[in-house]
């Protein structure tokens, strides 16, 4: 960990996502095939299983540079890694907190991965009191429960996830 103007920064491996976004308190699984992403997973597994996931600006970019990535992403905990045929890996992660990358550090050698110095961001709601926010969450849960009664193919896991919001 380093400090920049009083802000605590963590240095984490970066895994750029294409066509997918991870959020805090969300469990996501995805397949990884690019070497830079595999190296980021390996680096994270050696250092607390924590990784910074951020989206690429362009899906077609195969080897993203720091300028190809969004600065806001999610710090995630790696829960499971499965090796698949064809040198692909399926990863299960849990989003922990939103984060801002102050500095991306490109891989220096082919066997390295990209890193980022990230600052954890606080959860906040613009102009809404805590009481109002709780009321909005309750209303959303009630509406979702009503929807779930009519949805024929809704997984029980979705209802369990809703209950924990």
Model-derived features: positions:
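N-terminal low-complexity, acidic/polar interaction/targeting segments
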Residues: 1-162
């Amino acid at each position: 960990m380093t400090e920049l103007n009083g802000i605590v920064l963590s240095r984490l491996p970066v895994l750029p996502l294409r066509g997918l976004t991870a959020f805090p308190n969300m469990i996501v699984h995805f397949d990884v095939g690019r070497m830079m992403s595999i190296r980021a997973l390996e680096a994270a597994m050696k250092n607390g299983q924590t990784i910074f996931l951020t989206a690429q600006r362009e899906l077609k970019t195969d080897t993203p540079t720091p300028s190809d990535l969004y600065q806001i992403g999610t710090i995630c905990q790696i829960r499971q890694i499965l090796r698949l045929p064809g040198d692909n890996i399926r990863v299960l992660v849990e989003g922990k907190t939103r984060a801002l990358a102050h500095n991306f550090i490109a891989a220096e050698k082919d066997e390295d991965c990209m890193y980022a110095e990230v600052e954890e961001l606080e959860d906040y709601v613009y102009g809404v009191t805590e009481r109002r926010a709780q009321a909005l969450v309750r209303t959303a849960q009630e509406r979702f429960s009503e929807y779930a009664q009519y949805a024929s193919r809704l997984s029980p896991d979705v209802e369990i996830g809703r209950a924990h919001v």
